[in-house]
């Protein structure tokens, strides 16, 4: 779900924190991509003309593999070095949101069966997309494909977005890429959205900078996280009557959620009983992640035979197209630079100016003058 209305808040209150770039602007960058979000996106978007998920002759879903293969090709074609991060176990606090999702899936399946009988094609498609769920098999097959492609991946102990943010904070990658805005709550220095969208959508990459967001909002990291919880996140249900504008106003008025919960008018703001905002805050500020510094990311040459065996012989992909994709991978692995030039230069703190030693400067000048005189004598 992410954070409700956060993109709107940043565009209004911290416009300098948001910019939109062409994918080519990220040539030479390393990016950690939320694989679980990407797979969900592929299962929804990569479909046949009749709106159904792609399948092979055995009836196995292949939308996730088609998306992972060709969207990753587009990324490496543009000189980006991706690594993918997969979800681990969900935090206990997320069980409420997960239960709601299961209920929504079940309701959507029932509605889908009804609309197949009496509804339009558009209605059937809409309800079909609500039933999408990323399974362990989808994850395992995506990991197998990435390994064959020579693209590194990381198994996060918990939330993939949090691990992407940790990799970006450690400097192992330039940015975290996800459609979930809560990646910023995990203190990703830079968040990229729309990186794994199809080229046909012609969507620019939206880049969010956390430091500029905090400056624009005039908030600390803790206040920003409190704001996001108040907006509504996966860990806490939103408070009725509190939209984006009101949430910003309340954090500025009370400073913290602690004061808001303690002092706010409950008749005006019906805060749920046992509202776990403190636990949510802790999950954002102290997420369970692998230390980014200890993770080694290695990009390798693709295993052409392995890719053909998996995608063509096992999953029924078109062999000619897959071979063209392999050629693109091999070309990218040879041409993508180790790093951008600007990554080698870090700002150096300016040292205080030293007082000018006029005496030594004068003596140096006299020495230069005498040398010049000596040289001119020699020339004569």
Swiss-Prot record:
Pfam families: XPG_I, XPG_N
Coiled-coil portions: none
Cofactor remark: Binds 2 magnesium ions per subunit. They probably participate in the reaction catalyzed by the enzyme. May bind an additional third magnesium ion after substrate binding.
GO cellular component: cytoplasm; mitochondrion; nucleolus; nucleoplasm; nucleus; site of double-strand break
Assigned EC number: 3.1.-.-
A Gene Ontology BP annotation from the UniProt entry: base-excision repair
Places the protein is found: Nucleus, Nucleolus; Nucleus, Nucleoplasm; Mitochondrion
Region named N-domain: 1-105
Binding site for DNA: 47, 71, 159, 232, 234
SMART domains for this protein: HhH2, XPGI, XPGN
Region (Interaction with PCNA): 337-345
SUPFAM superfamilies linked: 5' to 3' exonuclease, C-terminal subdomain (SSF47807), PIN domain-like (SSF88723)
Keyword Nuclease among UniProt keywords: yes
Region annotation (Disordered) ranges: 340-380
PROSITE patterns: XPG_1, XPG_2
Chain positions found as Phosphoserine: 350-351
GO MF: 5'-3' DNA exonuclease activity; 5'-3' exonuclease activity; 5'-flap endonuclease activity; DNA binding; double-stranded DNA 5'-3' DNA exonuclease activity; magnesium ion binding; single-stranded DNA 5'-3' DNA exonuclease activity
Family: Belongs to the XPG/RAD2 endonuclease family. FEN1 subfamily.
Reported function: Structure-specific nuclease with 5'-flap endonuclease and 5'-3' exonuclease activities involved in DNA replication and repair. During DNA replication, cleaves the 5'-overhanging flap structure that is generated by displacement synthesis when DNA polymerase encounters the 5'-end of a downstream Okazaki fragment. It enters the flap from the 5'-end and then tracks to cleave the flap base, leaving a nick for ligation. Also involved in the long patch base excision repair (LP-BER) pathway, by cleaving within the apurinic/apyrimidinic (AP) site-terminated flap.
Protein name, entry field: Flap endonuclease 1
Lineage of source species: Eukaryota, Fungi, Dikarya, Ascomycota, Taphrinomycotina
Gene name in the database record: rad2
């Amino acid at each position: 779900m992410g954070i409700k209305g956060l993109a709107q808040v940043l565009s209004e209150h911290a416009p300098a924190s948001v910019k939109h770039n062409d994918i080519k602007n990220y040539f030479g960058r390393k990016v950690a991509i939320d694989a679980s979000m990407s797979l969900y996106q592929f299962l929804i978007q990569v479909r046949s003309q009749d709106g159904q998920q792609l399948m092979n002759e055995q009836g196995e879903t292949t939308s996730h593999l088609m998306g992972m293969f060709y969207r990753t090709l587009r990324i490496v074609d543009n000189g980006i070095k991706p690594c993918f991060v997969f979800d681990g176990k969900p935090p206990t606090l997320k069980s409420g949101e997960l239960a709601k999702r299961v209920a929504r899936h079940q309701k959507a399946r029932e509605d889908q069966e009804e609309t197949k009988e009496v509804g339009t094609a558009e209605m059937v498609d809409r309800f079909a997309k609500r039933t999408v769920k990323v399974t362990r098999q989808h994850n395992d097959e995506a990991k197998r494909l990435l390994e064959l492609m020579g693209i590194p991946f990381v198994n996060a102990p918990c939330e993939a977005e949090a691990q992407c943010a940790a990799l970006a904070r450690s400097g192992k990658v330039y940015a975290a890429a996800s459609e979930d805005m809560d990646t910023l709550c995990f203190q990703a220095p830079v968040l990229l959205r729309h990186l794994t969208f199809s080229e046909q959508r012609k969507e620019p990459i939206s880049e969010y900078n956390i430091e500029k967001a905090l400056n624009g909002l005039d908030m600390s990291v803790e206040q920003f996280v409190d704001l996001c919880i108040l907006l509504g996140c996966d860990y806490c249900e939103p408070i009725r009557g509190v939209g984006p504008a009101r949430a910003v106003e309340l954090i500025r008025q009370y400073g913290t959620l602690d004061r808001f919960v303690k002092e706010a008018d409950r008749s005006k703001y019906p805060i749920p009983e046992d509202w776990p905002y403190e636990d949510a805050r802790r999950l954002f500020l102290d997420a369970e992640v692998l230390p980014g510094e200890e993770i080694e990311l290695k990009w390798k040459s693709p295993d052409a035979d392995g890719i053909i065996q998996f995608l063509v012989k096992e999953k029924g992909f078109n062999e000619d197209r897959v071979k063209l994709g392999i050629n693109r991978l091999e070309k990218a692995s040879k041409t993508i630079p180790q790093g951008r030039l600007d990554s080698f230069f870090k700002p150096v703190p300016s040292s205080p100016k030293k007082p000018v030693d006029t005496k030594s400067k004068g003596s140096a000048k006299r020495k230069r003058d005498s040398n010049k005189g000596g040289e001119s004598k020699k020339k004569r």
